[in-house]
């Protein structure tokens, strides 16, 4: 009985560890998006200071290419929308993973209690193996 519970417990621990890895990966991805959001907001603020007489360039590979100011503003705006949507998606994913992780933690606690009871019953019944 205890061996069966121990195997089940080990499987649940592995599931929990995988959830923690996924959670960590999602947090890391969200942090990268936050950094991109900050950078793009700075670019948006800088572009807002410019008028039509200013020349704007964008980097394409190793080459700087002239770009219309309106086009640059639109591109940055679209990028900000995309990044914001991705952050929301990551937040939803993080909530789901945290909920699953909490459920897994509860399952582990129950299995540990069962295992301890089985061990105690085994120790309390000499002659039985």
UniProtKB/Swiss-Prot annotation:
InterPro entries listed in its UniProt record: PFD_beta-like, Prefoldin
Residue positions, PTM N6-acetyllysine: 21, 66
GO molecular-function terms, A-Z: amyloid-beta binding; protein-folding chaperone binding; unfolded protein binding
Glycyl lysine isopeptide (Lys-Gly) (interchain with G-Cter in SUMO2) crosslink, residue number(s): 66
GO cellular component: cytoplasm; prefoldin complex; protein folding chaperone complex; RPAP3/R2TP/prefoldin-like complex
Pfam family, any one: Prefoldin_2
Keyword Membrane set for record: no
Sites of N-acetylalanine modification: 2
One GO-annotated biological process of the protein: negative regulation of amyloid fibril formation
Record keywords: Acetylation, Chaperone, Isopeptide bond, Ubl conjugation
Residues in cross-link Glycyl lysine isopeptide (Lys-Gly) (interchain with G-Cter in SUMO1): 66
PANTHER family noted in UniProt: PREFOLDIN SUBUNIT 6
Subunit structure and binding partners: Heterohexamer of two PFD-alpha type and four PFD-beta type subunits. Component of the PAQosome complex which is responsible for the biogenesis of several protein complexes and which consists of R2TP complex members RUVBL1, RUVBL2, RPAP3 and PIH1D1, URI complex members PFDN2, PFDN6, PDRG1, UXT and URI1 as well as ASDURF, POLR2E and DNAAF10/WDR92.
Similarity comment: Belongs to the prefoldin subunit beta family.
Entry function: Binds specifically to cytosolic chaperonin (c-CPN) and transfers target proteins to it. Binds to nascent polypeptide chain and promotes folding in an environment in which there are many competing pathways for nonnative proteins.
Name assigned to this protein: Prefoldin subunit 6
């Amino acid at each position: 009985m205890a061996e069966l519970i121990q195997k089940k417990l080990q499987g649940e621990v592995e599931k929990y560890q995988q959830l923690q890895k996924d959670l960590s990966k999602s947090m890391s991805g969200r942090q990268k998006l936050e950094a991109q959001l900050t950078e793009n907001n700075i670019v948006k603020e800088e572009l807002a200071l410019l008028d039509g007489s200013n020349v704007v360039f964008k980097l394409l590979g190793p080459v700087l290419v002239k770009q219309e100011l309106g086009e640059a503003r639109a591109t940055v705006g679209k990028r900000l929308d995309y990044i914001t949507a991705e952050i929301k998606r990551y937040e939803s994913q993080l909530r789901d993973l945290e909920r699953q992780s909490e459920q897994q933690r509860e399952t582990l606690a129950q299995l540990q209690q069962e295992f301890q009871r089985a061990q105690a019953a085994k120790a309390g019944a000499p002659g039985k193996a």
